């Protein structure tokens, strides 16, 4: 399927595909989403009217992330999308700017595009050109990444109170699982920010942008420059909390080993004493010798445990 947008009074309006084909000159954005055979005729018709060859563009974008040619500007950039398992991942979106029209080639499940297209009235294009629209999409992407970074920070703060609590911690596995997910998300955000920075630097340095859009691109770049160290701090905090949890797990394991040593060492000593092959061992001839040995083993195992527990050494 595909979405087609027209610019009226500096605002975007979603158009019906059949209506647009008859008035193609006003189109500023064609968002192509997993086009199938049933729509190939319409796409071919649009391609002919716009004089753009999508098959040739796909060949160009296979070898290059960015390209500026006489035919147009081509950019491939990472955006967050949801995969089949409903997990967030970095996926490629292809952008083509040709004859003041923005083409986007992507799969479904990209949250930034859904957010942008659901609130078209909030996005006014003052200059009304395709570069302004492209930068608006990048700006929404950065806002989305910023929100995700803030969410990671809030989650880490909550986990910090749980991990650093003086009480004994239960559920180490779930905490480590949460931290692993946060670390993965933070890394994906880092890659996404770096990729967006490269795309914007390409636009600023290699493309002849209008003055307003060049200023807009530089502003987004400054925002990315501020976000990268912040996200790096988040990444380091995730690593610190992971190491803290691993340290607490080691302490808990040592405590368990200590309990086993305290409880089982004295009974083992008694049992091994009566395993010695001496000729004179009076207890072996007692009728109550065996129960006495069992009782003594239990007593010597329980007494040190209770004493250590009383002294709060365990």
From Swiss-Prot:
A motif (Probable selectivity filter) lies at residues 275-277. The chain crosses the membrane at residues 256-276, 288-308. It is found in: Cell inner membrane. InterPro entries: CorA_cytoplasmic_dom (IPR045861), CorA_MIT (IPR050829), CorA_TM1_TM2 (IPR045863), Mg/Co-transport_prot_CorA (IPR004488), MgTranspt_CorA/ZnTranspt_ZntB (IPR002523). The record marks 254 as: Essential for ion permeation. It catalyses: Mg(2+)(in) = Mg(2+)(out). GO terms for cellular component: plasma membrane. It is a multi-pass membrane protein. It holds the Pfam family CorA. The keyword Transmembrane helix applies. Keywords: Cell inner membrane, Cell membrane, Ion transport, Magnesium, Membrane, Transmembrane, Transmembrane helix, Transport. Homopentamer. In the absence of Mg(2+), interactions between subunits are weakened, and dimers, trimers and tetramers can be observed in vitro. The central ion permeation pathway is formed by the first transmembrane domain from each of the five subunits. Mg(2+) binding strengthens interactions between subunits and leads to the formation of a symmetrical homopentamer surrounding a closed ion permeation pathway. Low Mg(2+) concentrations trigger both a conformation change within each subunit and a loosening of the interactions between subunits. This results in an open ion conduction pathway. In addition, this results in a less symmetrical shape of the whole complex. Belongs to the CorA metal ion transporter (MIT) (TC 1.A.35) family. This is Magnesium transport protein CorA.
């Amino acid at each position: 399927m595909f979405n087609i947008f027209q610019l009226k009074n500096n605002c975007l309006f979603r158009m019906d595909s059949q209506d647009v084909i008859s008035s193609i000159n006003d189109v500023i954005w064609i968002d192509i989403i997993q086009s199938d055979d049933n729509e190939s005729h319409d796409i071919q018709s649009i391609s002919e009217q716009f004089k753009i060859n999508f098959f040739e563009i796909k060949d160009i974008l296979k070898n290059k992330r960015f390209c500026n040619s006489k035919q147009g500007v081509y950019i491939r950039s990472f955006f967050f999308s949801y995969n089949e398992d409903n997990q967030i991942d970095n996926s490629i979106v292809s952008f083509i700017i040709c004859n003041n029209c923005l083409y986007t080639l992507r799969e479904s499940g990209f949250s930034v595009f859904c957010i942008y297209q659901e609130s078209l009235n909030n996005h006014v294009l003052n200059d009304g050109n395709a570069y302004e629209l492209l930068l608006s999409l990048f700006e929404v992407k950065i806002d989305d990444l910023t929100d995700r970074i803030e969410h990671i920070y809030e989650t880490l703060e909550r986990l910090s109170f749980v991990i650093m609590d003086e009480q004994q911690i239960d559920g180490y596995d779930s905490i480590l699982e949460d931290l692993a997910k946060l670390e993965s998300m933070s890394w994906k955000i880092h890659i996404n920010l770096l990729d967006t920075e490269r795309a914007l630097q390409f636009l600023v340095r290699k493309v002849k942008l209008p003055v307003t859009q060049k200023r807009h691109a530089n502003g987004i770049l400054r925002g990315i420059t501020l976000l990268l160290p912040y996200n790096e701090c988040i990444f380091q905090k995730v690593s610190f909390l992971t190491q803290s949890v691993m340290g607490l797990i080691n302490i808990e394991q040592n405590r368990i080993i200590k309990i086993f040593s305290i409880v089982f060492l004295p009974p083992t000593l008694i049992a091994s004493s009566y395993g010695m092959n001496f000729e004179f061992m009076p207890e072996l001839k007692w009728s109550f010798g065996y129960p006495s040995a069992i009782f003594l083993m239990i007593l010597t195992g329980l007494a040190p445990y209770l004493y250590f527990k009383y002294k709060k050494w365990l």
